[in-house]
Regions:
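Intrinsic-disorder-linked linear interaction elements in eukaryotic regulatory proteins
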Residues: 1-3
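Membrane-proximal envelope and lipid/glycan-remodeling enzymes
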Residues: 5-648
Length: 648
């Protein structure tokens, strides 16, 4: 008996063998791919965690609360006490630039009942760290996620390496909130631009976030307007009532909160924007000082190097992937392009450049680097992380076609090296002295002047010159009076109230430039005002000094305050250096009808009629200016000078 195998059986056996080998090969090739996918995800998550941890440690090592941060807390104290969002009781002045920041700090202060300084420190650090997370999530989506590539931190390293970025990650100011909002907007805009199907609820959430821009900070309105313009002009998703109704709904959702607050602000405060904008006259131009401010950040850290390196890396990566940013010139094509990642990148880069030009135009600021941090963050967003795509065969399979990966690797190494250099660089070495540029390292300045490594609590600032003397002089004079700083650090000039003294005293008024440390070390019943006008409308509406220090280029003479506070206006009770004639002229100047209208807009009880009057006249109030010299103000207003010049 013989055994034989038919030809058909042989063919079937060969097919089964081939199929088995193919499946085995697929399984073997899938294992490295799965391992690489796991590695890629782990690399990205690890990069996010490492960035956040490094930033948190760096910021915590430089933790502090700035004097301007304490200004915010004075408003929060008044909110918690039921006095409203004001700096001084019975005077409606919006002394904080960021409305959202004020109410965010107030909410967590009310929720936790913790000490205000610790609340604002924790909230500021938290939103600063969240900004890094949102930035990296958005950029990861921009570059296609972790599939088949490694996403390595790049632009975020540049940001956190800068000492000013770590300084203002705490500080009590809104810097962290601004970049957190920008980072979240970036992430959601990228998601919107890449979505296969845009859902209406998520779209409305996006436009609501963008609409909050003017409440985050007035300059952020530019970013919000550009983002909303893109969304409004881009093709609409399917909506039951049609695209026109959806666009109307978008306008409503984006505008409901800022428009409602704007109406309330104009009626309540009598101004269309925060009083700080009036005090700093943000409409004025100081291009030369602005260029100094820009170089004060770019120069010492050689910041242009990582910006140039990452720009090259980003462009090379985009070109290697065949990305195009130039739409076809037709209305339909442009509208379609508006909902694309390249359009979102164009928007954030354009916003960063425009805001940089604006910061230069207004002269920058007196705080080293602070007013350029948002712009830098915007410019770094598209390269917050950069992708490294390895060849299928691993490192040994590199060919000339993989030149873009080599460029990115070189950029990462260069950025890492620069970050180590910048992180340990001290840009301003003048300590407690203010240079001719007027720019200071604010944290170092207060650390040295208070003798505290981490000035956080209000009482930490009692060791700042004049502060402890102020507290002692208020306690020693229960009848009240006007406190004016003297050249000495150990006492203040006190102008007493006129007789008879009312029961409980006439109240104290402190007139000093540093509003935060003064106001947080005295009761809310003590009126604290400043010659710059951040919390004092009369000073805010004075003319800007042509060659004054940036951010401090208004200074109202104390003669006006003697009159305004109702204190004794003759010697020997007034400080010796004050002129009785000037005080009398200031009294006459303050009788100007326009000035009186301005003052009562914030001091009259808030009735419905007062609200309507303020709402109608808010724009004219914002434009109104006085001359700080009483004699010249009398002439400007057309009043009769009590001390006319003799005829020549």
């Amino acid at each position: 008996m013989s055994l034989s195998i038919s030809p058909d059986e042989i063919v079937v056996a060969e097919q089964e063998t081939t199929e088995y080998e193919r499946l085995r090969d697929d399984e073997q090739s899938a294992r490295p791919a799965a391992r690489f996918a796991t590695l890629s995800r782990a690399t990205f998550v690890g990069g996010v965690v490492l960035t956040v941890v490094v930033f948190a440690v760096g910021a915590w090592q430089r933790r502090w609360i700035a004097d301007d941060g304490l200004i915010v807390l004075r408003t929060v104290r008044n909110l918690l006490a039921g006095n409203g969002p004001v700096f001084n009781m019975d005077e409606r002045v919006e002394a904080n630039t960021s409305t959202a920041w004020t109410y965010l700090v107030w909410f967590f202060s009310w929720l936790t009942q913790a000490r205000l300084e610790y609340v604002v420190l924790g909230v500021a650090l938290t939103v600063s760290l969240l900004a890094m997370v949102f930035a990296m999530l958005g950029t990861a989506r921009l570059w296609g996620g972790t599939s088949g590539q490694l996403l390595i931190p790049a632009g975020v390293l540049v940001y956190i390496a800068l000492p000013p970025a770590r300084d203002y990650a705490t500080s009590g100011l809104e810097s962290g909130l601004v970049i957190c909002w920008v980072g979240l907007l970036w992430w959601l805009m990228i998601r919107w631009s890449q979505a296969a199907v845009v859902r209406v609820p998520s779209l409305l959430g996006l436009v609501f976030l963008a609409g909050l821009a003017p409440l985050i900070r007035p300059e952020a309105t530019l970013i919000g307007v550009l983002a909303l313009g893109m969304i409004f002009l881009a093709p609409m998703p399917r909506f039951r009532y049609g695209p026109i109704a959806l666009r109307a709904l978008i306008v409503f959702v984006a505008g409901i909160v800022p428009v409602a607050y704007q109406i309330w602000r104009m009626g309540y405060y009598g101004l269309p924007y925060p009083n700080t904008a009036v005090a700093k006259d943000a409409g004025g131009a100081k291009w030369g000082q602005g260029m100094k401010y820009l170089w004060d950040l770019v120069g010492p850290y050689y910041l242009w190097i990582p910006l140039l390196v990452l720009l090259i890396a980003g462009v090379v990566t985009a070109v290697a992937r065949g990305v195009t940013v130039r739409p076809r010139w037709s209305v339909a094509a442009i509208r379609t392009w508006l909902r694309s990642p390249s359009a979102v990148v164009t928007m954030v880069l354009g916003s960063g450049l425009l805001l940089t030009v604006y910061a230069i135009r207004v002269g920058g600021d007196f705080m080293h680097g602070r007013m350029l941090l948002t712009q830098l963050f915007l410019l770094l967003l598209p390269v917050a992380v950069v992708p490294i795509r390895l060849p299928a065969g691993g490192l040994r399979a590199f060919t000339p076609r993989d030149w873009s990966t080599v460029v990115v690797l070189a950029a990462l190494l260069g950025t890492a090296g620069w970050s180590l250099y910048a992180a340990s660089t001290t840009a301003i070495k003048t300590g407690t002295k203010i240079s001719s540029s007027g720019i200071v390292d604010e944290r170092v300045y207060y650390v040295l002047n208070t003798g505290k490594d981490h000035p956080i609590l209000a009482e930490d600032y009692l060791d700042y010159p004049r502060m402890r003397a102020m507290v002692n002089d208020i306690a020693a004079n229960p009848n009240g009076g006007l406190l004016l700083n003297s050249p000495s650090y150990t006492f203040w000039y006190l102008d007493p109230p006129p007789q008879p003294i009312p029961e409980g005293g006439a109240g104290h008024t402190v007139y000093f430039l540093n509003l935060g440390m003064t106001s947080m070390n005295v009761p809310l019943s003590v009126r604290v005002i400043d010659p710059m006008g951040l919390a004092y409308p009369l000073a805010a509406h004075s003319d800007r000094l042509a060659d004054g220090r940036i951010g401090h280029d208004k200074s109202l003479y104390p003669d006006w305050v003697v009159v305004d506070s109702g204190m004794v206006d003759i010697h020997p009770w007034m400080p010796w250096y004050m002129d009785e004639e000037w005080v009398t002229q200031a009294r006459t100047a303050m009788s100007c009808p326009e000035t009186q209208a301005l003052m009562i807009s914030t001091r009259d009880p808030l009735t419905f009629d007062r609200f309507k009057h303020n709402l109608r006249h808010a724009l004219s109030f914002a434009k109104y200016r006085i001359d700080r010299v009483p004699k010249y103000e009398i002439q400007r207003c057309g009043l009769v000078d009590p001390f006319p010049e003799p005829p020549r």
